[in-house]
């Protein structure tokens, strides 16, 4: 760690905790989750941790719930347990626990559902003919029943109440108060921290406390953010119509925003403010040290390249600087880098175990489900 990036944090006693090395992050769609993911990928790479990854791309499941059989054999560590899960999936609690370290922290992030939906509508091209074939304003004008009748797009991955869907729930449960309450209870038990995108710095202070990490570990550049010119302005009436359609996500968001506020209130205010201000200052330091200019992500090369021109990327001053290059890396490029490194690491260990006559180093995968 850099020597000037501040003490670790645990409540108001900054020297008493031990850094944690395992975390499950349920990466929700269009909720600033790529920003958090970059933090976790940096930490995992720096400490040679093992990631849950698919054979290609940045998904391990979805729209079907996560299953351990989705992980290719060559990714598995010998222990059969992973340190970091930071890529898109659809939550299945029991299956996830089977592959994660027993001491893993559980974290996710939510966003104002109207803002999330507006972003997803544009980013995933809901408006094109092979999807919903209408503009966002035309969609807003539809009766609620017509909105609800539209199918999910992208092979079932994307649609309304996306956060509830990513968390493993059928949005139709919103009509059953008992099931809604059970959902909230189950998620409260499963997750140590539910971050809120509109409170990113505050959420990261709590993540830092949870993981006992340094300020540099949780500093960030915003990832996958669209240009302001692409956003659709919404009136109060537009928002009200979308809130009705996104009812289950609204319930989730309000519940966990309140829970986050309670977690913030549990930290001494002077400690919390000091760590928030330190995080902001550290981010500004790296912006000045690393970034030459912002650009369309699709115009950038190598591991900084984004797959769409809708989002911002960063031209760097010095691409050889480890911290700068990682802060600026696009999700796909960074994921490929981690996958290649883990493939090589697992191959070396299997070769070593094979020399020692230890079953060729075969990974110990969880037993098949009955």
Predicted regions and their residues:
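Anionic, Ser/Thr-rich low-complexity intrinsically disordered regions
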Residues: 233, 238, 243, 252, ...
């Amino acid at each position: 760690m850099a020597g000037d990036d501040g003490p670790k944090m645990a409540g108001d006693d900054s020297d008493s905790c031990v850094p944690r090395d395992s975390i499950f992050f349920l990466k929700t769609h269009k909720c600033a989750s790529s920003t958090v993911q970059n933090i976790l990928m940096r930490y995992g790479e720096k400490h040679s941790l093992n990631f849950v990854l698919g054979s290609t791309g940045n998904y391990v499941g979805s729209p079907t719930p996560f299953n351990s059989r989705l992980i290719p054999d060559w990714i598995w560590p010998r222990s059969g347990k992973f340190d970091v899960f930071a890529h898109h999936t659809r939550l299945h609690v029991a299956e996830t626990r089977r592959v994660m370290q027993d001491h893993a922290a559980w974290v996710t992030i939510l966003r104002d559902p109207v803002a999330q939906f507006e972003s997803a509508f544009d980013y995933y091209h809901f408006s094109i003919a092979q999807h919903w074939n209408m503009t966002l304003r035309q969609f807003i004008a539809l009766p609620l029943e017509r909105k609800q009748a539209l199918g999910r797009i992208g092979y079932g991955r994307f649609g309304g109440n996306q956060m509830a869907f990513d968390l493993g729930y059928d949005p139709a449960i919103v009509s059953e108060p008992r099931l809604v309450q059970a959902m909230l209870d189950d998620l409260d038990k499963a997750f140590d921290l539910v971050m809120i995108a509109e409170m990113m710095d505050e959420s990261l202070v709590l993540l830092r406390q949870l993981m006992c990490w340094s300020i540099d570990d949780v500093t960030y550049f915003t990832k996958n953010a669209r240009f302001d010119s692409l956003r659709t302005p919404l009136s109060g009436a537009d928002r009200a119509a979308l809130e009705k359609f996104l009812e289950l996500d609204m319930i989730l968001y309000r519940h966990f925003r309140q829970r986050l506020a309670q977690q913030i209130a549990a930290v001494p205010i002077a400690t919390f403010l000091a760590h928030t201000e330190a995080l902001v200052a550290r981010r500004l330091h790296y912006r000045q040290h690393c970034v030459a200019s912002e650009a369309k992500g699709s115009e950038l090369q190598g591991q900084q390249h984004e797959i769409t021109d809708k989002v911002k990327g960063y031209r760097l001053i010095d691409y050889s600087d480890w911290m700068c290059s990682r802060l600026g890396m696009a999700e796909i490029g960074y994921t490929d880098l981690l996958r290649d490194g883990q493939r090589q690491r697992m191959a070396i260990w299997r070769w070593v175990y094979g020399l020692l006559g230890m079953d060729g180093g075969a990974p110990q995968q969880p037993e098949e489900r009955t």
